[in-house]
């Protein structure tokens, strides 16, 4: 267990090394604001804390809280389509049972997540609840078990509200790739929420649920968090068990989480993280109580980030990045400087190599992982004259276009004669990316960049241009290749929609240093006094 905060300072070990060639960051701009809603702007507050306190005091019941969220979900879901399945009856029963236990004085009834409504991305297995992966090939599939992350949430008292929409098997950046529906962005329903965890991000943004789980293979938590104006966390590879997560690219897949505040996100991570005997890649490192290390706004010093060294990656602010995004990130960097940190530009020359390497490696692993969906072991079965036809027709009818394309790309990269030219070289690039991040993180406590090169774009804008869509992952894939933790916190707005479109700041750190990211993210979030990240969909009086 790490030591408690002392004198309310950020606990980051700072290594003094010889000064490398780099440029001091300078920016006159401040964090961009926009008239986001009619609500008064101010720091994000913890919904989890509020729910817990109201249950303990008897001010509210779990049934009341569940009814409130279900009511909001029913009003907004026809527009957003965030959920593939809503378990409303089960949620109401669980809430009533929680109230009964509290009333009878059972001391363990109010767990850390008691009464907290959670959305679960539909590529995480949930017992006796549809788990489709966003694919027709698993339509109607109901697992007999919970994914480890889901089980731990339930054990902490959380109520699973339903399964959120996603790009099929996590392959996409818009949630348009779902076999069932297209999710829209709560900030502008003509725009995408990002992906592949777009349903989870949109649901938290619209307050359809308190928090949600997602998965992140190349940015699938962080990019939609940026597009929807919520907090998104991709933990270190191995920090959270992958048992029960439908495999896309097993060396890259990570279970992540969304919240409307850093505190809520930290609370969820503490619950779901930790070693799991069902996942050999899960880490046995001790899991801190991340939320307890966060300092309330009234206790913050005037320069709470004194001594913290932050590197802003030069390659993420150049060609191909929207000017409004660059301005927001530079404004966020200036804000971090005002809080006492030293912000300098740092170059990662291998940064641009990560994107092609990622798509080769991820597609190669997907071509193997998805071979299990053959119409016999998993998936809907079609009538056929022989076994080969059964395999072919089941997969042709069950998989969508993007999934088929990535399977073909991965099979090609692994085939004889091309393995060395593609897969082997991509693995070599991955090693290079890991080393470049390791070197940079020996000089800086945290690295920052945009979470995406643009804000949310129009539905249909890139669906027929896969290269343009893939290029949108440039900011996030390197973190997965390196296995590092990353946190996205809303930092500003760009023009678009009726009230502006949110932009997210990505913070990256060393392995298993989620606590550092959460502490910096919390301080950053709590000192953004002039911004509100509640979407216009939830106008005053409709919350």
From Swiss-Prot:
NCBIfam families to which the protein is assigned, alphabetical: gatA (TIGR00132)
The keyword Ligase is annotated on this UniProt entry: yes
Protein species of origin: Zea mays
Record function comment: Allows the formation of correctly charged Gln-tRNA(Gln) through the transamidation of misacylated Glu-tRNA(Gln) in chloroplasts and mitochondria. The reaction takes place in the presence of glutamine and ATP through an activated gamma-phospho-Glu-tRNA(Gln).
Cited PANTHER family: GLUTAMYL-TRNA(GLN) AMIDOTRANSFERASE SUBUNIT A, MITOCHONDRIAL, TRANSAMIDASE
Name listed for the protein in its UniProt record: Glutamyl-tRNA(Gln) amidotransferase subunit A, chloroplastic/mitochondrial
GO CC terms: chloroplast stroma; glutamyl-tRNA(Gln) amidotransferase complex; mitochondrion
A GO BP annotation: glutaminyl-tRNAGln biosynthesis via transamidation
Enzyme type, top EC level: ligase
Protein family membership: Belongs to the amidase family. GatA subfamily.
Reaction equations catalysed: L-glutamyl-tRNA(Gln) + L-glutamine + ATP + H2O = L-glutaminyl-tRNA(Gln) + L-glutamate + ADP + phosphate + H(+)
Subunit structure: Subunit of the heterotrimeric GatCAB amidotransferase (AdT) complex, composed of A, B and C subunits.
Family matches, as Gene3D superfamilies: Amidase signature (AS) domain (3.90.1300.10)
Organism placement in taxonomy: Eukaryota, Viridiplantae, Streptophyta, Embryophyta, Tracheophyta
GO MF entries: ATP binding; glutaminyl-tRNA synthase (glutamine-hydrolyzing) activity; hydrolase activity, acting on carbon-nitrogen (but not peptide) bonds, in linear amides
Gene label: GATA
HAMAP family: GatA
Domain of life: Eukaryota
